[in-house]
Curated annotation (Swiss-Prot):
Origin species: Petunia integrifolia
Coiled-coil intervals: 173-423, 641-697, 784-807, 882-905
Protein name, as recorded: Kinase-interacting protein 1
Bias (Basic and acidic residues): 726-736
Record comment regarding domains: The NAB domain is capable to bind actin filaments.
Region (Disordered): 151-170, 586-614, 714-740
Domain (NAB): residue spans on this chain: 10-90
Gene Ontology terms: cellular component: cytoplasm
Compositionally biased intervals (Polar residues): 599-610
PROSITE patterns hit by this protein: NAB
Post-translational modification: Phosphorylated by PRK1.
Amino acid sequence: MLQRAASNAYSWWAASHIRTKQSKWLEQSLHDMQGRVESVIKLIEEDGDSFAKRAEMYYKKRPELINFVEESYRAYRALAERYDHLSKELQTANNTIATIFPEQIQLAMDEEDEYGAPKMPKDFLQMPASGSNIPKVPPKAPIKDLKGLMSTASKQKQGKQSSKIEDAAKSGLSKNEAIEEIDKLQKDILALQTMKEFIRSSYQSSLEKFRGLENQIMEKQQKICELEDEFGEGRVIEDAEACTLMAEAALQSCQETVTQLQEKQESYTQEAREEFKKIEDACNKLNSFRHKYLGDQIDEAKVYISPIQEVDKEIESLQEKIKDQIDATSKGSLTMSQLAEKIDELVNKVVSLETAVSSQTLLLERFRAEADELQAQVQTLEDDKAALTDTHNLNIRVTAIEAKLQNIENLNKDVVNQNSCLRTHFVEARANIDHLSDKLSSVQPDEEIDGTDSSPDQVIALAEIKLEEESLKQKDHPSSAEGLKNLSTIKAEGPKNLSTIKTEGPKSLSTIKAEGPKNLSTIKAEGPKNLSTIKTEGPKSLSTIETEVPKNLSTIKTEDKEVRKQQGSSTVVSDKKTTMKHVTFAQPTPAEKGDEKVSAQSGNTSVYETHTQKSAEKDDELNWQQMLLSGLDDKENILLNEYTAILKNYKEVTKKLSDIEKKDRDTEFELTLQTRELKSAIAKRDEEIHNLRQKLSLMQQGNASENKALKEELLDPSDPSSARGLKPEDLPQIKDGDDEEDVKTILVDQRATVSPLEGKLRMSIDAILDENLDFWLRFSSAFHQIQKFKTTVHDLQNEISKARDKEMQGNSPRVDVKSEIRPLYKHMKEIQNELTVWLEQTLSLKDELERRFSALCSIQEEISKGLKEEVEDETTFSSHQAAKFQGEVLNMKHENKKVREELEAGISRVTILQEDVEKTVTQLDQEFGLTGNQSQLMQSVSKSRIPLQSFIFGTKPKKEKRSLFSRMNPNRKF
């Protein structure tokens, strides 16, 4: 709910603009109709001077006029059919919008007559004798109040009872049974009609309240916009503050709704007590009457008395325990997401309470009707003095009244049970509202708090509270003594069973603990739900549980979860198809008792439920069999529980999916950061390597120059004093091999020096290669268009030949052929223009190929010139490098030649295609005169413009020309 409110928080204005554009079909139809009208007018304008010419006009041109009328009728019919189709689609769209967004549609909820649709007048289907054939709108069904509805229902009941049913054997019932069944169904219908009226009134009031709130929101938003426009400043509410405000509003609304529901429930309880007093009075009268006239022949009738005081005391104790347990289970702070989930659960619970309170109205109305009928029967029995003499008939009537009294007692039990359930849910809702209101001030963001583990004591306490709720509901059934014994047994054995579940194995405990806080928080969140019965399902599900408790009190309805052991020690909790299952607590085996102490000290609980697919299918079959045997009410409850469980599973899967997507986004972001860091580190390392290589090259050059100077100085023959006392062995031994090895060891990874000519050639070749991508893209797109042009022209020529064949065979007149040829002619002209543009574009490709060829030739000349000349630098341009460059250039020239050949072939094909298109266009123009019509239309458009002279100086009045229609009928005066 909070997410919907947040998503709609800023969507105050909604503007939808429906722009219509003219359909090509409509435009073509209008154009064709205009041409046909012009041709028919020309045909009509012709005058017949002689009898022969008039006869020719009659016999020759009359079929053309008839054909024109038929074609006009067909065109109008097609237009009407399209309009009808669009009207149906629009009606369907309106119904769909009204179904999906009922709050946007003004609903006129007219009351229905009796139990079905409103009655139509007798003359509704009769067509009027004259005038339009449109039927009149039927009058609105008469609106009746609740009393009138009840009176008509009772009258109909009496009328149907008085009628004779001849075919009673078809239903398999006797006459008396059929009358009883009709009576029961009539009462059910009356109760449902009452419920419908109540829901309708509540819906209308809720709808008015909704619209009022929407108007207030719009007014406040408009005021905000005005203030922002006036002062030029705005304020944005922070996310935390907005969430807090929405949570406070939701809690306040829930609290007000619960208060109103409690007041209604108290009033209903008071009414039920008054009706119960009436039943007690009737029972006392019946007992006194029986003692007076029948003696001790029949046992006294006993009235079921509801233990209201005991229920009140137990509800007070339950309220205190619920508050203590809620405080114990949530000692830490709540995150914003946890708070939103809890508020959503609370809102769903309040909505279910509203439905339960409204259903209590139906039950109370039925209880009141039964009590009134019982009083009437007792009073009739007392007033009928003639029947007092006949003891046999008197016994029969008293027995019938006692059976009626027994039914009323059962109905009273249902009222008391529903009352206790509602009070229990009210207590729980109040406690949750108070708890969330207290936690609202200490809400933290989602990242600042982790889920904590739930202790076994808390789980046991939750189970005890729920078992007390079951006992509270079962105490209202005095006939279920055996069920209460089983309930007390389960209540006493509850902690033992929980400890048994807790001792299912330390391996699964350690494994689930190793899975991380996510699995633990999931188990913590789902644990109380599984241990407690479904409290949020509403009174219907609670009443279903009440009927099932005496049969199987040791079973608990939970979601289907499996714990499978993988690799000896790992357990995986997997959600499967959510079904209604009965899971019994396992008893500890002797082998497991040794591990009980270890698992008790761990402080965590492990959910261990193993169900195979076969057992799931059996449980499903049992549920459906139970649903069919239990009747309509239990079937609805079971279906409601099934739907709620599926919806809960869907929410969990959606939450897990969002968590996985969030993890994927985080992982992708981390990988992006790591990639950036690696790129920066690699760039720094490359820069350092480059600097070190430069330093090494400088050091090598310096050492070589020093060694050379030292040799020259020592071996200089012009200085005799320097070589006087020196011997050859005293000179430093400098070996070329050692120097080469030193250079190789130092410059292992150093790149070879590049000559200027080699660098220049490499730059030229790289420039040509860089242009290859753009060139190939343009060439491929141009080459691809050739096949497209060829296919289009071929299709158009086929269509033109088909139209000509129709004209030759005489199947269609020339006007229709001309209307079919016109769009083909336009398309052919467009293709002709596109072919011209394509040829112009290919000229640039040819120029670029020539430029690339000349560039490659110049590179070849530079390579040959570099081999002949000697380079003055230390490094020379070797023949190996020249051969390498020469091979690259030759490959590029070969590719260039192939591309030029393909381009020339494509140009020749397009040129032939262009000639064919021009020839076809010329033939169409000569045959049908399509260019002339376009020039006439252009002239008519130009004539309709106002000249500048007339616009400035005005126009002189001219003589009126005779219109086209006056020429058609010259004798008629306008």
